[in-house]
Amino acid sequence: MGSLGKVNNEIPTKSSGGSKVLVIGGTGYLGKRLVKASLDSGHDTYVMHRPEIGVDIEKVQLLLSFKMQGAHLVSASFDDQRSLVDAVKLVDVVICAISGVHIRSHQILLQLKLVEAIKEAGNVKRFVPSEFGTDPARMENAMEPGRITFDDKMVVRRAIEEAGIPFTYVSANCFAGYFLGGLCQPGYILPSRDHVTLLGDGDKKGVYVDEDDTAAYTLRAIDDPRTLNKTIYVKPPKNVLSQREVVGIWEKYIGKELQKTILSEQDFLATMREQNYAEQVGLTHYYHVCYEGCLSNFEVDDEQEASKLYPDVHYTTVEEYLKRYV
């Protein structure tokens, strides 16, 4: 197919609010939500796309829908450093949402090229790299092979900080779509009405965040001096729950108790080792959350927690989220 155009120079339909924002990875699972949140916030919003998209009609239609809502489409590529520099020169804030999930694609280190482009451009006031999960700085003892996710994110962090680029890191813990839909069971995204496997005793607390809320909080943070060069945590108090508590909410909705099987730590690890590499990476993350409680073994100050920083943002509770599956 032909190009969508290097830049849509038409005036966005929404009034500009604050910084000009470039979203990279804007057609992805979280990226499309970041674009929507940016537009909804009134930001002059730019969405980067590859010069040629082939015949990926869904991606093209999504990009065109962004354009119709007032976004600028910017043609650039990680294989063309000059195009990256030109793209970031258009904006004040860069938000990157390229995939770091191995079952999709793991592209975290591509951001090193983006860091170089931002450094060369010299105009970016805030960079939000692709993180949005567990804080990698707290995972230095993570298990193989899943630790590669955290290690690579730390490589990018060091490059950002060594380059002197202003940043905000967003730790949004567990995506609700992946965790709540399957009642915290790996490999499931719809809740059963009959049976659930509890990981260990099912009592380790996780933190479950609606992806739209992650996007909304991120867009609030980009112009906030309180979040400059800091990590913010999306840890809404009503969403800090154990697997048993999540299951209990679901049981209340469907009016019955699920049959429960306990999966011991040893059996989980044995099963994990039988999977392919990409699956093992994801299962390692489940292990740290559900067996070790890595999301609830530390306290977060109010000035670093998103729902405290922005109390006017209504976040979706676990109860509200699960209701859609009834």
UniProtKB/Swiss-Prot annotation:
Cell division found in the keyword field? no
What induces or represses expression of this protein, per its UniProt record? Answer: Up-regulated by continuous blue light and fungal elicitor treatment. Not regulated by salicylic acid.
Which residues participate directly in catalysis? 153
The EC designation for this entry is 1.23.1.2, 1.23.1.1
Which sites bind NADP(+)? Answer: 25-31, 50, 59, 157
Keywords, in A-Z order: NADP, Oxidoreductase
Superkingdom: Eukaryota
**Catalyzed reaction equations:** (+)-lariciresinol + NADP(+) = (+)-pinoresinol + NADPH + H(+); (-)-secoisolariciresinol + NADP(+) = (+)-lariciresinol + NADPH + H(+)
List this protein's GO terms for biological process.
(+)-lariciresinol catabolic process; (+)-pinoresinol catabolic process; (-)-lariciresinol biosynthetic process; (-)-secoisolariciresinol biosynthetic process; lignan biosynthetic process
* Residue positions binding substrate: 285
Q: Which GO terms describe its molecular function?
A: lariciresinol reductase activity; pinoresinol reductase activity
The secretion signal range is none
Please indicate if the UniProt record lists NAD as a keyword: no
State how changing residue 286 to L affects the protein, per the record: No effect on enantiospecificity. No effect on enantiospecificity
Spell out the Pfam families in the cross-references. Answer: NmrA
Which EC class is the enzyme in? oxidoreductase
Q: Which Gene3D superfamilies match?
A: NAD(P)-binding Rossmann-like Domain, UDP-galactose 4-epimerase, domain 1
Task: Explain the purpose of this protein.
Answer: Reductase involved in lignan biosynthesis. Catalyzes the enantioselective conversion of (+)-pinoresinol into (+)-lariciresinol and of (+)-lariciresinol into (-)-secoisolariciresinol. Abstracts the 4R-hydride from the NADPH cofactor during catalysis.
Q: How does it assemble?
A: Dimer.
Similarity remark: Belongs to the NmrA-type oxidoreductase family. Isoflavone reductase subfamily.
What is the name listed in the Swiss-Prot or TrEMBL entry for this protein? Bifunctional pinoresinol-lariciresinol reductase
Q: Which gene encodes it?
A: PLR1
